[in-house]
A protein has these predicted regions:
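Acidic, surface-exposed loops and disordered segments
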Residues: 1-153
Length: 153
């Protein structure tokens, strides 16, 4: 079972589950992993727990005192976005990795994170391998019209 420091929806349903499945299909097709190849699928999952074998993993945390931490989560998202844009501008690839914190107690132990901090997310960082098929996969994004409502413009 997943053991995270914050409340998290474990099992997606409906359109959110379908998006998750569609991305997995894209990824496994790009990498030549067949649906029934449990060994290669497991290897991919374990790679996520290893931060995709990246040389650097940032672990973003916040002070537990701030819980419930809605605005803090927003702030950490903005921080992650800034770090990622800056890194990519310098040729360093990044992957936001929620899988890497599914066992927060293990991350806490190995990264020496104090108990008064909640682990929010990891960012795997390194120079991209242009020959690695997974690096070419891009998830399908909704159009702005599906996400935004303009009032007064």
């Amino acid at each position: 079972p997943h053991v995270r420091d914050f409340a998290y929806k474990e099992d997606y349903e409906g359109e959110h589950r379908q998006k998750q499945i569609d991305l997995a299909i894209q990824l496994f097709e790009a990498m030549g992993i067949k649906r029934d190849d449990k060994e290669k699928r497991m290897d991919w999952m374990l790679r996520g727990f290893r931060q995709f074998d990246a040389p650097v993993s940032l672990v973003l945390t916040y002070d537990k005192y701030l819980e419930p931490a809605g605005i803090t989560h927003f702030g950490l998202g903005a921080l992650a976005y800034g770090i990622i844009l800056s890194a990519w501008e310098r040729g360093v690839g990044c992957v936001i990795n929620g899988q890497g914190i599914m066992q927060s107690h293990i991350v806490r132990k190995h990264a020496n994170i104090p108990d008064d901090q909640s682990i929010m997310i990891c960012i795997a960082m390194g120079y991209p391998d242009d020959n690695f098929a997974a690096n070419d996969v891009r998830s399908v994004r909704a159009d702005n019209d599906e996400l935004l409502t303009y009032v007064g413009f």
